[in-house]
């Protein structure tokens, strides 16, 4: 994997920095594990915008990724690594000994031809999945469940991981990348290693059009709007907004805490770093 900074042969390539991975499959994805993906433009069932800055973009297929890894005791061989337009991480197509193929998140260091295994008796090596109670202290893990059997929800993006720092009865304590220390049931599953494609954060798209290809629309500043559109809007000439920064709905931004899920506060040992 290499970081390539393009020469300024055009305005769009002047700031283009891309990640080149020659291990990625260049052909078509595995068709039985594809699903249709319709665009919403950020609108809900009433046609109202619920998520801003979404719309357009290239048509994509959804890759059905196995986040549960429940095929215990059946070894699988990595056939190839693939690009996935739906996430920052790459995915791996694996062939199980019983003939079934599945997509999984590709951890760092996994290559075509490697073998992986799920279950209690799996060896301690990247790509293998097992319950948290069977993972040694200090291990780096990813694709972590929050509830047993629900599927991975934590540490799924490129370059992310968590560290297992303590075990206490029915719970284990994890240190997340944000600095948060959190308790999770020890029956939840996780995969060893960190997610690959960590260079993803170093890329630069180079031009606005590259964001539009990905379905991302422009972000307009509130002070550039009219008063009907934003609390910072209006005024004669350029203004500072006239108040502390807020969202379009008047909620303070820039560090204002909005977490309201008190029910799960008991699982958070230490809040994330600011």
Swiss-Prot record:
GO terms for molecular function, please? rRNA binding; structural constituent of ribosome; transferase activity
Q: Which NCBIfam families match?
A: rplB_bact
> What family does the Swiss-Prot or TrEMBL record give for this protein?
Belongs to the universal ribosomal protein uL2 family.
Q: Which InterPro entries match?
A: NA-bd_OB-fold, Rib_uL2_dom2, Ribosomal_uL2, Ribosomal_uL2_bac/org-type, Ribosomal_uL2_C, Ribosomal_uL2_CS, Ribosomal_uL2_dom3, Ribosomal_uL2_RNA-bd_dom
Q: Quote the protein name from its UniProt record.
A: Large ribosomal subunit protein uL2
Q: How does it assemble?
A: Part of the 50S ribosomal subunit. Forms a bridge to the 30S subunit in the 70S ribosome.
Query: GO CC terms for this protein?
Result: large ribosomal subunit
Q: Which SMART domains match?
A: Ribosomal_L2, Ribosomal_L2_C
- Chain segments carrying region Disordered: 223-274
Pfam families (alphabetical): Ribosomal_L2, Ribosomal_L2_C
Tell me the keywords, alphabetical order. Answer: Ribonucleoprotein, Ribosomal protein, RNA-binding, rRNA-binding
* Protein task: One of the primary rRNA binding proteins. Required for association of the 30S and 50S subunits to form the 70S ribosome, for tRNA binding and peptide bond formation. It has been suggested to have peptidyltransferase activity; this is somewhat controversial. Makes several contacts with the 16S rRNA in the 70S ribosome.
Q: Does the keyword Transmembrane helix apply?
A: no
The organism named in the record is: Colwellia psychrerythraea (strain 34H / ATCC BAA-681) (Vibrio psychroerythus)
Query: Gene3D superfamilies attached here?
Result: 2.30.30.30, Nucleic acid-binding proteins, Ribosomal protein L2, domain 3
Q: Which PROSITE patterns match?
A: RIBOSOMAL_L2
Entry superkingdom = Bacteria
Q: Which GO terms describe its biological process?
A: cytoplasmic translation
